[in-house]
Amino acid sequence: MEALQRQQAARLAQGVGPLAPPRLPLPQPPLLGARTLQAPEGAIGVVGAEEEEGAEDEEGETPLAEEETAEQSHPGARCPNSPSSQSPGIQPHEWTYEEQFKQLYELDADPKRKEFLDDLFSFMQKRGTPVNRVPIMAKQVLDLYALFRLVTAKGGLVEVINRKVWREVTRGLSLPTTITSAAFTLRTQYMKYLYPYECETRALSSPGELQAAIDSNRREGRRQAYTAVPLFNLAGPTPRGAPGPASSHGPAPTATPNCPGPTQGSASGLPAHACAQLSPSPVKKEESGIPPPRLALPMGLASEATREKLAPEEPPEKRAVLMGPVDSPRLGAPPSFLPRGKAPLREERLDGPLNLAGSGISSINVALEINGVVYTGILFARRQPVPASLGPTNPPPLPSTGPPSSTLP
């Protein structure tokens, strides 16, 4: 019985082993001794044990293979000291600043340069705004170390902006002085790379003071641009009692006797409507004994503005009286005939030698350009009072200036 149980156990062990070599069935002799059966049983049992140990070895090797596969798919995950995890391409923060910005470190042999640049780049990295590239200006590397020293030596960025000493900073950096936007470029580069470090280490100014300095500088630039363009003084508001164009636009200076003779002669020969075709040009101040009041309109726009002003308000008869051919005032006429804006022209009594029309507005603003000089003034119509319903009439001939006639009735 014991021999049969051993034989069955050997057969079971022979069938379970996965790597057991194929064996031919042994012939069973009719008469087997106990010693004969023990030998194959022991051999079979040894083989089965070896097969079981081989299976266990294979199962133990499986995690190692999986670890090797994981290491191949994820290099550097096994341990932090592996060579693959220390490669500079995977962890760029291990590069030194000197290797990244070698050009800045090699601009000169100042021993404080490396210390300053390391401190600057480390501060910007901790601040969350790392310096990712070397600033370039005028096709060369911008020396941040020299720029910081020059600006802080003059009191900081705000002081440099207020005093406008960027040209000195440009010279100190050995940059070409022909750069038109050198001040703006240096200011923006300093604000981006160096101003936070200045506030942290020197505390020469605050961001609020910097913004105020920039706004003030911008306003001054606009003011200079405005003053560079010649401006013309337009007439201000006048009393509402004077409806005429002369009073609505304000009084204007007339030709004075101090003007040259040829200019006056040519001005008196031009028609009044020719002033609308004159091109604008700067008004030149001329010497006169009377201080000139404000100009009524700039250059040749006087008559056009008069036409537009009278179009919706005055009847056709008054427009014809206003824009018709008129005679220029005499050169020796005193300046007291100018309207003062106190009462309408039709109700004024003028003491001058001119006979003004009493039917309405009888003057226009004129601007003539002769030989590059613009003359402005008021022309008055010399007409007899006529009813407005009869329409305009031809002006009467000028009164004779000779001796009075001796023919009497």
Swiss-Prot record:
Entry's Pfam families? ARID
Q: Which residues form the ARID domain?
A: 110-202
Query: REKLES domain: from which residue to which, for each copy?
Result: 301-386
The annotated regions of Basic and acidic residues compositional bias extend over 306-320
Keywords from UniProt, A to Z, are: DNA-binding, Nucleus, Transcription, Transcription regulation
Q: Where is the composition biased (Acidic residues)?
A: 49-70
Report the record's Gene Ontology biological process terms.
Answer: macrophage differentiation; positive regulation of transcription by RNA polymerase II
Q: Which Gene3D superfamilies match?
A: ARID DNA-binding domain
Q: Where is the composition biased (Pro residues)?
A: 19-30, 393-402
Report the domain remarks: REKLES domain is required for interaction with NPM1 and nuclear shuttling.
State the function annotated in the UniProt record.
Transcription factor involved in monocyte-to-macrophage differentiation. Forms a complex with NPM1 to translocate to the nucleus, acting as a transcription factor that promotes the expression of the genes involved in macrophage differentiation, such as STAT3, STAT1 and JUNB.
Query: What name is this protein filed under?
Result: AT-rich interactive domain-containing protein 3C
Q: Which organism is it from?
A: Mus musculus (Mouse)
Classification lineage: Eukaryota, Metazoa, Chordata, Craniata, Vertebrata
Q: Which gene encodes it?
A: Arid3c
